Amino acid sequence: MILVFKHFFYKNYVGLSLWPFIILKDNTLKEDIVLINHEKIHLKQQQELLILPFYIWYITEWLLRSLFYLDSYKAYQNISFEREAYYNENNLDYLNQRKFFSFIKYLWRY
């Protein structure tokens, strides 16, 4: 289910997945198939980690990478879940091909 909340987002962020919802900044973004695919990849990640462990892992990885990079945005870009989603967002068939726990291989540079 896709929801729209214009005032929910910080700076340039436009989408967020909170299982089972995709939350967008603007109604027109519903037509952005690449963004929707990116967020669907996150929904799959959340589902396979049984939701709560996903968020714990995501925040922990972001904190560790923030310490490593000393840059919170670079840390965000390098979270394994984000790497997988960004790397595969243009492949609209990715979720049909994706193997279980695929995000693991993105813990290290791809």
Locations of regions flagged by a protein language model:
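Metalloprotease/metallohydrolase-associated module, dominated by Zn2+-dependent proteases
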Residues: 2-13, 53-110
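A structural signal for well-ordered alpha-helical segments within the folded catalytic domains
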Residues: 16, 34, 47-50, 79, ...
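Catalytic Zn2+-binding segment of zinc metalloproteases
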Residues: 40-55
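Active-site scaffold of zinc-dependent metalloenzymes
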Residues: 3-33
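Membrane-interface extramembranous regions at the lipid-water interface
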Residues: 30, 34-39, 43, 91-93
